[in-house]
């Protein structure tokens, strides 16, 4: 999608996060403390990224997930910004900056913590999956 169209479609924060590799403030974002059942999709493309089943309270200040809905929906990239080395997470289809993945997650779930900016996500409640075109993901919740 063209940058000008994206600027009109997204909030200023969502644009800064997804297109300019920004980071929203910790603990003051939409999904850090949000635990309803449903699907988290890329705010740019609508691509399904994470389910509420894999979300947990990590205490980091951003939504944290143990894994994406499918390994192919995200891509990882080495990030050497801010005088440290991390692994950036981007959406596969829209190439949106989502956040970072760390190896300090729950050991019983594979020890990964996908630390994702709320501004990069849109939440689709479980009871609206079919209506919004995400019916194929209902099976994840049974």
Curated annotation (Swiss-Prot):
Record-stated family: Belongs to the MsrB Met sulfoxide reductase family.
Presence of keyword Oxidoreductase: yes
Gene Ontology biological process terms in this record: protein repair; response to oxidative stress
Molecular function via GO: peptide-methionine (R)-S-oxide reductase activity
Superkingdom per UniProt: Bacteria
Natural source organism: Lactococcus lactis subsp. lactis (strain IL1403) (Streptococcus lactis)
Enzyme class: oxidoreductase
Active-site residues, as the UniProt record annotates them: 115 (nucleophile)
Protein name: Peptide methionine sulfoxide reductase MsrB
Lineage of the organism: Bacteria, Bacillati, Bacillota, Bacilli, Lactobacillales
Signal peptide: none
Family matches, as Pfam families: SelR
Record InterPro entries: Met_Sox_Rdtase_MsrB, Met_Sox_Rdtase_MsrB_dom, Mss4-like_sf
């Amino acid at each position: 999608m063209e940058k000008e169209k994206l600027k009109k479609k997204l909030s200023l924060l969502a644009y800064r996060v997804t297109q300019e590799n920004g980071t929203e403030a910790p603990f003051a974002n939409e999904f850090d403390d949000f635990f309803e059942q449903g699907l988290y999709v890329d705010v740019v493309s609508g691509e399904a990224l994470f389910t509420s089943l894999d979300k947990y309270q990590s205490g980091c200040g951003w939504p944290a997930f143990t894994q994406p809905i499918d390994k192919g929906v995200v891509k990882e990239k080495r990030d050497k910004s801010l005088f440290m080395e991390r692994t950036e997470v981007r959406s596969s289809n829209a190439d949106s900056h989502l956040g970072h993945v760390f190896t300090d997650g729950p050991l019983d779930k594979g020890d990964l913590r996908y630390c994702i900016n709320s501004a990069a996500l849109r939440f689709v409640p479980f009871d609206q999956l079919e209506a919004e075109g995400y019916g194929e993901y209902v099976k994840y919740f049974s």
